């Protein structure tokens, strides 16, 4: 099974080696056919503290690193 990759934007960088990344997805409502935007936040491990607020990043799913961290920053776009 391959790991999931998601593109998101860093919104908070106040913790050491941790960033909070916001992702946005669009889906269509089944009945009303309206486009719905879904926003989700992920707590992400930033090994070398290389990301800054506003950076667009690719995050990669990994084993649990702490109570809330299950994602790692793969690269900055």
UniProtKB/Swiss-Prot annotation:
Compartments in which it is found: Plastid, Chloroplast
Alphabetical GO biological process terms: translation
Keyword terms, alphabetized: Chloroplast, Plastid, Ribonucleoprotein, Ribosomal protein, RNA-binding, rRNA-binding
SUPFAM superfamilies: Nucleic acid-binding proteins
Role: One of the primary rRNA binding proteins, it binds specifically to the 5'-end of 16S ribosomal RNA.
Subunit structure: Part of the 30S ribosomal subunit.
UniProt name for this protein: Small ribosomal subunit protein uS17c
Gene designation per UniProt: rps17
